């Protein structure tokens, strides 16, 4: 009994609830009940743990603290855990491998690093933060692995196989907002800035193009006004080439 009591207090300390060990469940908040449930699951030291959105009722800072604790427990005890969440950062931070599911089917199973850099298709790309997905076709194959590709509306850019690997005749290019840079010179994808928002370290621009609304980031030193015509240049470090598939010309809401 003493060992069980000791183990229970240890788990309550891990979830930050030891000071409320004697409080009745009816006197606990939703977030506190969630942490108690987590402690109950951990205290029996199971070889396999199943978590279904265990941190959903916690505030942002506590969520970060708790996922660190869960990861430490996994690694210390060599436990296997299946963890269900819609939070990308949460999934990546505690996992050795992540499965992305669509309509009940696994569409990609990989390490967090591979998922983040090389999504298998447009669905996975959107889940891991590629907000801009554009169909393209190759119009010219140049020297040194470079290709000229054209987007809807006629904008053309040069891509390199050194950055993307083999580039198909038709495909999708997916970019994160930091992968598109506004350029007043008009190079890249032709757009008009529809909305500018200040994020602190950068400005975010919602740019209207023939292919729909694209989200880009720009320096705070040289902001552009709404209504400005700009070209968007593509940074391959924050972009990926995907297999061609039919997608909506407008961003999902």
Task: Give the ranges of each region predicted by the language model.
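ABC ATPase nucleotide-binding domains
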Residues: 1-123
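ABC transporter nucleotide-binding domain
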Residues: 111-144
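Glycine/charge-rich catalytic "coupling/switch" loops of P-loop NTPases
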Residues: 117, 132, 146-197, 221-253
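Short aromatic-glycine-enriched beta-strand elements
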Residues: 146-147, 202-205
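Short, structured beta-strand/loop micro-motifs enriched in basic residues and often containing a Trp
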Residues: 154, 211-214
């Amino acid at each position: 009994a003493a060992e069980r009591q000791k183990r229970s207090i240890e788990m309550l300390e891990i979830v930050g609830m030891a000071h409320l060990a004697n409080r009745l469940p009816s006197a606990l908040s939703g977030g506190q009940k969630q942490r108690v449930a987590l402690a109950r699951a951990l205290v029996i030291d199971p070889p396999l743990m199943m978590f279904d959105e265990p941190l959903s009722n916690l505030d942002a800072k506590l969520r970060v603290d708790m996922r660190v604790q869960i990861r430490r427990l996994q690694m210390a005890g060599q436990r296997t855990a299946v963890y269900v969440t819609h939070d990308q950062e949460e999934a990546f931070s505690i996992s050795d491998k992540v499965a992305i599911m669509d309509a009940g089917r696994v569409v990609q199973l990989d390490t967090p690093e591979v998922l983040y850099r090389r999504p298998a298709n447009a669905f996975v790309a959107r889940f891991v933060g590629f907000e801009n997905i554009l169909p393209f076709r190759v119009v010219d194959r140049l020297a040194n692995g470079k290709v000229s590709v054209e987007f809807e509306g006629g904008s053309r850019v040069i891509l390199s196989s050194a950055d993307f690997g083999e580039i198909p005749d038709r495909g999708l290019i997916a970019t994160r907002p930091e992968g598109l840079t506004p350029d007043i010179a008009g190079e890249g994808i032709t757009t008009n800035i529809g909305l500018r928002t200040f994020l602190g370290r950068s400005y975010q621009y919602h740019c209207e193009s023939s292919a729909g609304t694209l989200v880009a980031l720009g320096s705070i030193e040289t902001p552009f006004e709404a209504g400005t015509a700009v070209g968007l240049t593509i940074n391959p470090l924050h972009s990926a080439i995907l297999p061609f598939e039919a997608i909506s010309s407008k961003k999902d809401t």
